[in-house]
Amino acid sequence: MRESLLYGLTAAVVTTLWLRWVMRSEVQAAVERDPAAGSAWQVLFLYPSVSAVAFHRVAHVLHRSGLPGCRFLARLLSQGARAATGIEIHPGAKIGKGLFIDHGMGVVIGETTEIGNNVTLFQGVTLGGTGKEKGKRHPTVHDNAVIGAGAKVLGSITIGKNAQIGANAVVIREVPANSVVVGVPGRVVRQNGEKLRQE
């Protein structure tokens, strides 16, 4: 009894400290990238993306724990977060530090998605599958990428570092680092600061 109480208290303290650290990087990302952010306190309490990512961090730990019933609890937590924030993140998704989801409503992040550090997503973004794959079926988004409002990034593809994807683009092919992609289907129009000739 005494050991389980001590274990529970230790787990609670570690989880609290961990969430504070995690939320700090999300809050800082919002303050730095959103000109409308008044203060860190405003972001912490009023930005749904911070809440959604915090819920996800807990759900992800539960999802990966392998303990009986934890996957169900993880899905329950993620569905509660979706209802509260309008942002759907599967508990299996791997997310780095400093994710900023601006406005957030309608964002969907699939189970096998991997997101690097300091990525920005706008409202209505889908990081989803094509429905044709098994296993790794969602995108990998590398550090500092920006994905515009309404963009759909589908399949087990890679979005390179510092890539920018324009609003409403539909991306189903690899995106190189330091490039800009627009259109349906998405095409690279700029890479390493150079405008590309379209043929």
What are these regions (language model features)?
Residues 84-85, 90-91, 96-97, 102-111, ...:
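Left-handed beta-helix
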